[in-house]
């Protein structure tokens, strides 16, 4: 559906050239909900502006439904933009138009026959659950209701793609949940491809099928939402997942575990002591891992911290365990975990923000 190849965008600033996007490659499939996430300054907004060519990339190509956009003239581009609906963070509703009037506006601009507009607007208002507020003005409705108007307006021309640029970041958690449920429902009913631009990992967890993580203008991680939450690879992704799930060790806990490791190592110098982070998903998240490790490899295994989340119907778990045993047994246990497709990281003694870790299995 959306094919982005080698996309780059540079801006001139008083301090020199700034590379907002660098070599972006993304293939977004028809009908999926795709998340683009990253911290502030990662290039998310620039990317969404390039997708609908509000910003022209310096190099690279963008195609939607097989139609290349970069080389189009203004008239052709206007027609193609009607295939792309846009939902904004700030609603951008016209204060002097009613809910009905705001939804009707893009149809009027597109030159839809007057006789056709009422039925199309009523259908859209029913789709977003606002038919009872059709005659209200923006000042008379809530933030969540305003965003529903924005979604209906974005769908007015029956687009193939719906771009959501931080559409929930100004909303409270309950309203955010309701808006995301609405977007998912619209996606299922209409088949529209939804691209979610967000800095909120909670949004990705709730609605997105796949996610791309941006950092400093580059895609640093790409995968299904379940995979990214279960085993984030890049440090930016790890930090965002940890913040969203509280799945990392606190500084105080890590310091206490370090003291325990030192004490165990001093008490039994011939035995290896390791702190592991295990990332599991699906059936593996419910398996009795530490009892298996203790029985099969004669390891003493204690649970430091555990968290299991439901990510779109799949259990995704993060476990921190302290393992002690003969060095060869520890090595064999790591191999056994790898065979179960469990990601294992050995946590060094440094604080969590600076610690070194390595992937034993992915």
Curated annotation (Swiss-Prot):
Domain ABC transporter, chain residue ranges per copy: 2-241
Pfam families: ABC_tran, NIL
Keyword list, A-Z: Amino-acid transport, ATP-binding, Cell inner membrane, Cell membrane, Membrane, Nucleotide-binding, Translocase, Transport
Gene3D superfamilies per the UniProt record, alphabetical: 3.30.70.260, P-loop containing nucleotide triphosphate hydrolases (3.40.50.300)
Membrane topology: Peripheral membrane protein
PROSITE patterns: ABC_TRANSPORTER_1 (PS00211), ABC_TRANSPORTER_2 (PS50893), METN (PS51264)
Enzyme Commission (EC) number: 7.4.2.11
One Gene Ontology cellular component annotation held by this UniProt entry: plasma membrane
ATP-binding found in the keyword field: yes
Disulfide bonds: none
Enzyme class: translocase
Domain of life per record: Bacteria
Function field: Part of the ABC transporter complex MetNIQ involved in methionine import. Responsible for energy coupling to the transport system.
Known partners and oligomeric status: The complex is composed of two ATP-binding proteins (MetN), two transmembrane proteins (MetI) and a solute-binding protein (MetQ).
Family named by the database record: Belongs to the ABC transporter superfamily. Methionine importer (TC 3.A.1.24) family.
Protein name per the record: Methionine import ATP-binding protein MetN
């Amino acid at each position: 559906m959306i094919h982005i190849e080698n996309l780059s965008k540079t801006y001139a600033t008083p301090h020199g050239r700034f590379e907002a996007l660098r070599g972006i490659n993304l293939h977004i499939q028809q009908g999926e909900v795709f998340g683009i996430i990253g911290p502030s300054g990662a290039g998310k907004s620039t990317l969404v502006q390039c997708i609908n060519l509000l910003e022209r990339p310096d190099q690279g190509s963008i195609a939607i439904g097989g139609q290349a956009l970069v080389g189009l003239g203004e008239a052709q581009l206007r027609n193609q933009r009607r295939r792309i609906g846009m939902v904004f963070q700030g609603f951008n509703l016209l204060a002097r138009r009613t809910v009905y009037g705001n939804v009707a506006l893009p149809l009027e601009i597109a030159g839809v026959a007057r006789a056709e507009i009422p039925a199309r607007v009523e259908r859209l208002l029913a789709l977003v659950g606002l038919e009872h507020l059709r005659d209200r003005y923006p000042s008379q409705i809530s933030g969540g209701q305003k965003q529903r108007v924005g979604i209906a307006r974005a769908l007015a021309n029956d687009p193939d793609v719906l771009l959501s640029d931080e559409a929930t970041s100004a909303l409270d958690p309950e309203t955010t949940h309701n808006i995301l449920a609405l977007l998912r429902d619209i996606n299922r009913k209409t088949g529209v491809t939804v691209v979610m631009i967000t800095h909120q990992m909670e949004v990705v967890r709730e609605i997105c099928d796949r996610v791309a993580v941006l950092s400093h203008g580059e895609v640093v991680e790409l995968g299904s939402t379940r995979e990214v939450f279960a085993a984030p690879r890049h440090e930016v992704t790890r930090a965002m997942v940890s913040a969203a799930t509280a799945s990392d060790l606190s500084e105080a806990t890590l310091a206490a575990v370090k003291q325990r490791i030192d004490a165990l190592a001093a008490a039994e110098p011939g035995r290896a002591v390791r702190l592991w982070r295990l990332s599991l998903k699906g059936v593996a998240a419910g398996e009795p891992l530490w009892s298996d490790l203790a029985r099969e490899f004669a390891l003493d295994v204690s649970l430091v911290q555990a968290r299991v989340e439901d990510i779109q119907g799949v259990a995704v778990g993060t476990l921190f365990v302290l393992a002690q045993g003969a060095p060869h047994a520890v090595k064999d246990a790591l191999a056994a975990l790898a065979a179960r497709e469990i990601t294992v990281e050995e946590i060094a003694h440094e604080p969590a923000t600076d610690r070194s870790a390595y992937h034993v299995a992915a």
